Amino acid sequence: MDALSETLRVVRLVGAIFINARFTAPWCYQSPRADTVAPVLEPGAERVVIFHLITEGECYVEMANEPPVRLVAGDAIVFPQGDAHRMTSQPGLPPATGGRLDRVLARRPRQLDYGGGGPATRLVCGYLACDARLAGMLLTGLPSLVRVNVRGSNAGAWLEASVRYALAEARSPRPGGAGVLSKLAEVLFIEVLRLYMNEQSEGRTGWLAGVGDRVVGAALKAMHKDPAHAWTLDELARTASSSRSVLAERFQQLVGSSPMQYLTQWRMLLAANLLSRSNAPLASIAEDVGYQTDTAFSRAFRREYGAPPAAWRRSQSMRVQA
């Protein structure tokens, strides 16, 4: 399993909501910062990632201190940092009264249909809540706006057909419909990340850039495949068919940490995932993430999370119950 797939297996993407929007020019729709609507999407959510898919027509997206970006049918845009933005038929329009995301989410069904009667644009809006630390690692280095066109990918036709199915589910909810919408939103989001990786240009940094790099990607794959292994820089360099110095420099440049620091971070993320999702004893979790003693594991976990594993597990349990 590659590093992206392994990370997505651990990252919890929950609370997916689809909004089916039809606008007719002129129109302008304001989306506030994601953290302001997080309580509506998923109570207690640590991080919210927002994305839109243009299914018909064209429009612009506007963000503070950034030039407007023109979007066409098939374009998918993701806001990794949850920035406020405007979707509009042309730059410079004020948002319409009632055209705010936090107000729309209070309606059932979650649909938008308004504008001035001109050319129509259709959008699908997806919102996913996820673990802050895992999402932080996955999305680090990404720009405030990621844009790809899904129609150019092999999965494009399937994705658009799936979105149409999701919209039908939203109009006529059936048992299990919420789960279907959540999975479809997750798949669409993952496909956007994959397309972005394939389109990466020179000079990009971040975890996804590291996954796509020949040297760093090989080291990441090895650590994610067997996190309990007693990896050394020498062994990782051999795995990546590289020298120690090249691997260390390239890893720091793209991921922002040394390979050994990253290994510890990944192990602690896995441990936190096991602590919050299972009743496994601490000794078993420690062994699963590469620690021979509870003491060494507890010390490393406290450095990362500010509390011993047992206390952190109890706090997570109390948070869920609340």
Language-model region placement:
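Basic/polar phosphate-binding segments, predominantly the helix-turn-helix DNA-binding elements
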Residues: 187, 191-197, 218-269, 286-311
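A short, N-terminal "cap"/entry segment at the start of jelly-roll beta-barrel domains
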Residues: 1-30, 120-122, 136-154, 322
